[in-house]
Amino acid sequence: MVKVCLFVADGTDEIEFSAPWGIFKRAEIPIDSVYVGENKDRLVKMSRDVEMYANRSYKEIPSADDFAKQYDIAIIPGGGLGAKTLSTTPFVQQVVKEFYKKPNKWIGMICAGTLTAKTSGLPNKQITGHPSVRGQLEEGGYKYLDQPVVLEENLITSQGPGTAMLFGLKLLEQVASKDKYNAVYKSLSMP
Protein backbone atom coordinates (compact mmCIF):
# COMPACT_ATOMS: atom_id res chain seq x y z
CA MET A 1 0.00 0.00 0.00
CA VAL A 2 1.10 3.56 -0.75
CA LYS A 3 2.32 5.68 2.16
CA VAL A 4 2.83 9.44 2.12
CA CYS A 5 5.33 11.68 3.92
CA LEU A 6 4.38 15.33 4.31
CA PHE A 7 7.47 17.17 5.52
CA VAL A 8 6.86 20.05 7.90
CA ALA A 9 9.07 22.66 9.56
CA ASP A 10 8.54 25.82 11.55
CA GLY A 11 7.15 28.38 9.10
CA THR A 12 5.43 25.86 6.80
CA ASP A 13 2.30 27.24 5.15
CA GLU A 14 -0.84 25.87 6.83
CA ILE A 15 -2.90 25.61 3.65
CA GLU A 16 -0.16 23.88 1.66
CA PHE A 17 0.14 21.38 4.50
CA SER A 18 -3.57 20.89 5.18
CA ALA A 19 -4.81 20.45 1.60
CA PRO A 20 -2.75 17.35 0.69
CA TRP A 21 -3.14 16.03 4.25
CA GLY A 22 -6.92 16.17 4.02
CA ILE A 23 -7.01 14.71 0.52
CA PHE A 24 -4.92 11.65 1.42
CA LYS A 25 -6.87 11.15 4.66
CA ARG A 26 -10.14 11.19 2.68
CA ALA A 27 -8.64 8.60 0.33
CA GLU A 28 -7.69 6.48 3.36
CA ILE A 29 -4.06 6.46 2.27
CA PRO A 30 -1.63 6.48 5.21
CA ILE A 31 0.16 9.81 5.65
CA ASP A 32 2.72 10.99 8.22
CA SER A 33 3.80 14.50 9.05
CA VAL A 34 7.59 14.34 9.35
CA TYR A 35 9.16 17.21 11.28
CA VAL A 36 12.42 18.78 10.15
CA GLY A 37 13.73 20.84 13.04
CA GLU A 38 15.22 20.80 16.51
CA ASN A 39 12.14 20.78 18.79
CA LYS A 40 12.30 17.41 20.58
CA ASP A 41 8.51 17.44 21.07
CA ARG A 42 7.99 17.90 17.29
CA LEU A 43 5.85 20.98 17.98
CA VAL A 44 5.62 22.96 14.75
CA LYS A 45 4.67 26.63 14.56
CA MET A 46 3.28 27.22 11.09
CA SER A 47 3.63 30.44 9.08
CA ARG A 48 0.36 31.95 10.39
CA ASP A 49 0.81 30.82 14.01
CA VAL A 50 -1.12 27.53 13.85
CA GLU A 51 0.67 25.01 16.05
CA MET A 52 0.65 21.25 15.61
CA TYR A 53 2.60 18.19 16.67
CA ALA A 54 4.17 16.22 13.84
CA ASN A 55 3.83 12.42 13.81
CA ARG A 56 7.57 11.88 13.78
CA SER A 57 10.94 13.54 13.32
CA TYR A 58 13.14 13.02 10.29
CA LYS A 59 15.89 12.14 12.77
CA GLU A 60 14.03 8.87 13.48
CA ILE A 61 14.74 7.73 9.92
CA PRO A 62 18.36 6.55 9.53
CA SER A 63 18.84 7.30 5.83
CA ALA A 64 17.17 8.30 2.58
CA ASP A 65 17.25 4.63 1.58
CA ASP A 66 15.32 3.69 4.74
CA PHE A 67 12.92 6.53 3.99
CA ALA A 68 12.29 5.10 0.51
CA LYS A 69 11.41 1.74 2.09
CA GLN A 70 8.74 3.44 4.23
CA TYR A 71 7.26 6.04 1.88
CA ASP A 72 6.15 6.33 -1.74
CA ILE A 73 5.35 10.04 -1.89
CA ALA A 74 7.42 12.88 -0.41
CA ILE A 75 5.64 16.25 -0.21
CA ILE A 76 7.51 19.50 0.41
CA PRO A 77 5.24 22.44 1.22
CA GLY A 78 6.14 26.10 1.09
CA GLY A 79 5.91 28.97 3.50
CA GLY A 80 9.01 31.17 3.51
CA LEU A 81 10.81 29.95 6.62
CA GLY A 82 9.58 26.36 6.31
CA ALA A 83 10.63 26.13 2.66
CA LYS A 84 14.06 27.51 3.50
CA THR A 85 14.53 24.87 6.20
CA LEU A 86 13.28 22.01 4.04
CA SER A 87 15.21 23.04 0.91
CA THR A 88 18.52 23.37 2.79
CA THR A 89 18.31 20.23 4.94
CA PRO A 90 20.66 17.55 3.54
CA PHE A 91 18.31 14.70 4.52
CA VAL A 92 15.41 16.20 2.55
CA GLN A 93 17.72 16.87 -0.41
CA GLN A 94 18.91 13.25 -0.34
CA VAL A 95 15.32 11.95 -0.21
CA VAL A 96 14.43 14.05 -3.26
CA LYS A 97 17.48 12.76 -5.17
CA GLU A 98 16.71 9.15 -4.24
CA PHE A 99 13.01 9.40 -5.09
CA TYR A 100 13.76 11.01 -8.43
CA LYS A 101 15.77 7.93 -9.47
CA LYS A 102 13.18 5.35 -8.40
CA PRO A 103 10.10 4.07 -10.24
CA ASN A 104 6.78 4.31 -8.40
CA LYS A 105 8.04 7.13 -6.18
CA TRP A 106 6.53 10.61 -6.35
CA ILE A 107 7.82 14.02 -5.28
CA GLY A 108 5.44 16.91 -4.64
CA MET A 109 6.64 20.48 -4.13
CA ILE A 110 4.52 23.58 -3.75
CA CYS A 111 5.17 27.32 -3.48
CA ALA A 112 8.72 28.12 -2.27
CA GLY A 113 9.13 24.41 -1.49
CA THR A 114 9.94 24.05 -5.21
CA LEU A 115 13.38 25.50 -4.46
CA THR A 116 14.19 22.02 -3.14
CA ALA A 117 14.40 20.85 -6.76
CA LYS A 118 17.25 23.31 -7.24
CA THR A 119 19.04 22.65 -3.93
CA SER A 120 18.75 18.88 -4.48
CA GLY A 121 20.32 19.14 -7.92
CA LEU A 122 17.40 17.67 -9.86
CA PRO A 123 17.86 17.86 -13.63
CA ASN A 124 16.40 20.92 -15.31
CA LYS A 125 12.70 20.37 -15.75
CA GLN A 126 9.51 22.21 -16.44
CA ILE A 127 8.41 23.47 -13.05
CA THR A 128 6.12 25.91 -11.36
CA GLY A 129 6.18 27.50 -7.95
CA HIS A 130 5.29 30.71 -6.21
CA PRO A 131 6.01 33.71 -8.48
CA SER A 132 8.40 35.05 -5.81
CA VAL A 133 10.83 32.15 -6.48
CA ARG A 134 10.49 32.15 -10.27
CA GLY A 135 13.80 33.96 -10.77
CA GLN A 136 15.70 31.55 -8.55
CA LEU A 137 14.23 28.56 -10.37
CA GLU A 138 15.05 30.03 -13.79
CA GLU A 139 18.59 30.86 -12.62
CA GLY A 140 18.87 27.17 -11.75
CA GLY A 141 18.04 26.29 -15.35
CA TYR A 142 14.42 25.24 -14.80
CA LYS A 143 11.72 26.21 -17.27
CA TYR A 144 9.14 28.03 -15.17
CA LEU A 145 5.55 27.53 -16.30
CA ASP A 146 2.89 29.95 -15.05
CA GLN A 147 0.39 27.15 -14.37
CA PRO A 148 -1.35 26.02 -11.17
CA VAL A 149 0.15 22.51 -11.26
CA VAL A 150 2.89 20.99 -13.42
CA LEU A 151 3.54 17.25 -13.79
CA GLU A 152 6.99 16.40 -15.13
CA GLU A 153 7.92 12.71 -14.87
CA ASN A 154 7.59 11.88 -11.16
CA LEU A 155 7.82 15.50 -9.97
CA ILE A 156 4.62 17.46 -9.33
CA THR A 157 4.94 21.17 -8.58
CA SER A 158 2.38 23.82 -7.76
CA GLN A 159 2.20 27.58 -7.23
CA GLY A 160 0.93 28.20 -3.72
CA PRO A 161 -1.92 28.20 -1.20
CA GLY A 162 -4.55 28.95 -3.83
CA THR A 163 -3.56 25.89 -5.87
CA ALA A 164 -3.02 23.52 -2.94
CA MET A 165 -6.21 21.50 -3.49
CA LEU A 166 -5.37 20.95 -7.17
CA PHE A 167 -1.84 19.97 -6.12
CA GLY A 168 -3.08 17.40 -3.61
CA LEU A 169 -5.53 15.97 -6.13
CA LYS A 170 -2.83 15.66 -8.81
CA LEU A 171 -0.67 13.71 -6.35
CA LEU A 172 -3.61 11.49 -5.42
CA GLU A 173 -4.43 10.88 -9.08
CA GLN A 174 -1.00 9.26 -9.57
CA VAL A 175 -1.46 6.60 -6.88
CA ALA A 176 -5.19 6.00 -6.34
CA SER A 177 -7.68 4.04 -8.39
CA LYS A 178 -9.96 6.07 -10.64
CA ASP A 179 -12.92 5.21 -8.40
CA LYS A 180 -11.09 6.32 -5.25
CA TYR A 181 -9.91 9.53 -6.92
CA ASN A 182 -13.43 10.34 -8.15
CA ALA A 183 -14.93 9.67 -4.72
CA VAL A 184 -12.45 12.02 -3.04
CA TYR A 185 -12.91 14.67 -5.72
CA LYS A 186 -16.68 14.53 -5.29
CA SER A 187 -16.42 14.68 -1.49
CA LEU A 188 -14.48 17.95 -1.75
CA SER A 189 -17.27 19.78 -3.65
CA MET A 190 -14.71 21.01 -6.17
CA PRO A 191 -16.05 23.64 -8.59
UniProtKB/Swiss-Prot annotation:
Family: Belongs to the peptidase C56 family.
Gene this protein is translated from: hsp3106
Listed EC numbers: 4.2.1.130
UniProt organism field: Schizosaccharomyces pombe (strain 972 / ATCC 24843) (Fission yeast)
Presence of keyword Lyase: yes
Name the UniProt record assigns to this protein: Glutathione-independent glyoxalase DJ-1
GO annotation (BP), single: glyoxal metabolic process
Lineage, opening ranks: Eukaryota, Fungi, Dikarya, Ascomycota, Taphrinomycotina
Family annotation (Gene3D superfamilies): 3.40.50.880
Function text: Catalyzes the conversion of methylglyoxal (MG) to D-lactate in a single glutathione (GSH)-independent step. May play a role in detoxifying endogenously produced glyoxals. Involved in protection against reactive oxygen species (ROS).
